[in-house]
Design a protein with these regions (language model features):
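A short His-aromatic
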Residues: 73-74
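Core SAM-dependent methyltransferase catalytic element
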Residues: 142-160
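Class I SAM-dependent methyltransferase SAM/SAH-binding core
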Residues: 5-7, 11-55
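Short, glycine-/aromatic-enriched active-site segment of Class I SAM-dependent methyltransferases
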Residues: 101-117
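Conserved beta-strand signature within the Rossmann-like core of class I S-adenosyl-L-methionine
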Residues: 93-100
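A short glycine-rich, Lys/Arg-flanked "PGG" loop and its adjoining helix->strand segment in the class I
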Residues: 80-92
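A conserved beta-strand element that flanks and buttresses the S-adenosyl-L-methionine
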Residues: 66-67
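Short alpha-helix
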Residues: 118-133
C-alpha cells in the first residue's frame, strides 16, 4: 500500500478511513486533541499525531500528502509557509492534494455550531509556490461539481 499523510485529518472520515480500507498506511495529523481522540476511536489503524501542521517535521516522506478542507483555514502567510513542509514530507513522485477557494479572498463559514475562517491566495500564487518548492502543478479544478464544489489542486513532487 501507499504511505499517506493526512494533514488536518479531523475524525479521519471519510478520507483516512478510505485509504485504510485500501490497505494504505495513513498518518493523520490534527492540532485539536478532541479530533485525535475521535480519529483513534473511528479509524484506529491510522497513526494519529497531534501537531500543528505549520510546524510539522515527521522526518519521513509519503506517497500522498493531503490537506483537504484544512489548509484553507490558515491565513496567507501560514499557507505560504506550508509549501516547504509539503516538500520536506515528499519524495520524487509524491502527490499533493489540497483544497483552496476558487480565487483570492477571505470568507467565514460555519461547521456545525462554529464559525470558521477560509482564506485563499490567487491560483497563480499557488502555482508559483508549487513550482518554487519542487512540485509540478497537474491540475486545479475550481468549484468542481464532481468534488462537492470544492476547489482542488493536484501536484506531483519532482524535487526540481
Amino acid at each position: 500500500g501507499l504511505r499517506v499523510l493526512d494533514l488536518g485529518c479531523g475524525s479521519g472520515q471519510p478520507i483516512a478511513e478510505w485509504f485504510v480500507r485500501r490497505g494504505d498506511a495513513v498518518t493523520g495529523v490534527d492540532g485539536a486533541a478532541a479530533m485525535i481522540v475521535e480519529l483513534r476511536a473511528r479509524v484506529p489503524e491510522v497513526h494519529a499525531v497531534r501537531a500543528d501542521m505549520r510546524a510539522l517535521d515527521l522526518g519521513e516522506t509519503y506517497d500522498i500528502i493531503l490537506a483537504f478542507n484544512s489548509f484553507f483555514h490558515l491565513g496567507a502567510e501560514s499557507q505560504r509557509s506550508m509549501f516547504p513542509i509539503f516538500a520536506a514530507h515528499a519524495a520524487t513522485g509524491s502527490r499533493l492534494l489540497f483544497t483552496t477557494g476558487p480565487a483570492h479572498g477571505e470568507a467565514w463559514g460555519t461547521v456545525g455550531q462554529s464559525e470558521v475562517y477560509h482564506m485563499s491566495l490567487a491560483p497563480d500564487a499557488y502555482r508559483d509556490l508549487l513550482a518554487e518548492h519542487g512540485f509540478k502543478d497537474l491540475w486545479f479544478r475550481p468549484e468542481d461539481p464532481d468534488l462537492n464544489g470544492h476547489s482542488v489542486w493536484l501536484a506531483e513532487f519532482t524535487g526540481a
